[in-house]
């Protein structure tokens, strides 16, 4: 099981941000980025889910205040990174839970304005950490990272999976990966025999091929 982040790793850039009134009203806490500020990777998701306040410590960023701390997606993505293996800083393109007006326990897609309001935070995190690569989990996270680099997604998302994109505007390389909710379905359709095959392909797509896997066993 992946390690749960320590509270002091939480990188609150604006503790009570209210740029988006709807999100300020729907969130419980802002799910800020967390992890080493000199990490090899920055992992970017779309936005935190509602989470489960009654779960163990993996309650989700809406309750922990830290990105990628949900029981399903959070642990699954952290397990992927642990298997690469590299240290990672985890964040979301939109930091607050975007509640669906019809069902406040479910997510809606963040609006273009909400993405734009949060984009300076995302760009600041990436530039501050200065990772060798950014792993964007899913289409919307990929689009948000590209927008922060003044770029856009060319073609379909599945064609972009594990196809590195140099982002000199952010000083890093973007590597789109499958969203954890759909990984098991789509990795087979994309030709990966099993999870180990997919993890090896993710590692190979990184600029270093996986920092510790390429001769840096004793680092960190």
Model-derived regions: residue spans:
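A polyanion-binding, active-site-adjacent surface
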Residues: 2-220
């Amino acid at each position: 099981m992946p390690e749960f982040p320590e509270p002091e790793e939480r990188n609150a850039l604006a503790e009570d941000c209210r740029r988006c009134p709807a999100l300020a009203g729907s969130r419980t806490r802002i799910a800020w980025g967390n992890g080493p500020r000199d990490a090899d990777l920055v992992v970017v998701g779309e936005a935190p889910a509602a989470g489960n306040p009654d779960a163990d410590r993996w309650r989700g960023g809406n309750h922990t205040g830290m990105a990628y701390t949900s029981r399903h997606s959070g642990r699954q993505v952290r397990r992927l990174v642990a298997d690469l293996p590299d240290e990672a800083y985890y964040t979301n393109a939109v930091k607050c839970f975007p509640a669906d007006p019809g069902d406040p326990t479910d997510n809606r897609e963040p609006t273009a304005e909400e993405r734009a309001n949060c984009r300076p935070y995302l760009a600041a995190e990436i530039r501050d950490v200065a990772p060798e690569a950014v792993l964007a989990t899913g289409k919307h996270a990929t689009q948000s990272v590209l927008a922060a680099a003044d770029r856009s997604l060319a073609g379909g998302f599945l064609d972009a999976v594990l196809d590195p994109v140099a982002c000199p505007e952010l000083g890093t390389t973007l590597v789109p990966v499958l969203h954890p909710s759909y990984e098991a379905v789509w990795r087979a359709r994309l030709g990966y025999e099993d999870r180990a095959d997919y993890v090896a392909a993710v590692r190979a797509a990184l600029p270093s091929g996986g920092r510790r896997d390429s001769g840096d066993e004793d680092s960190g």
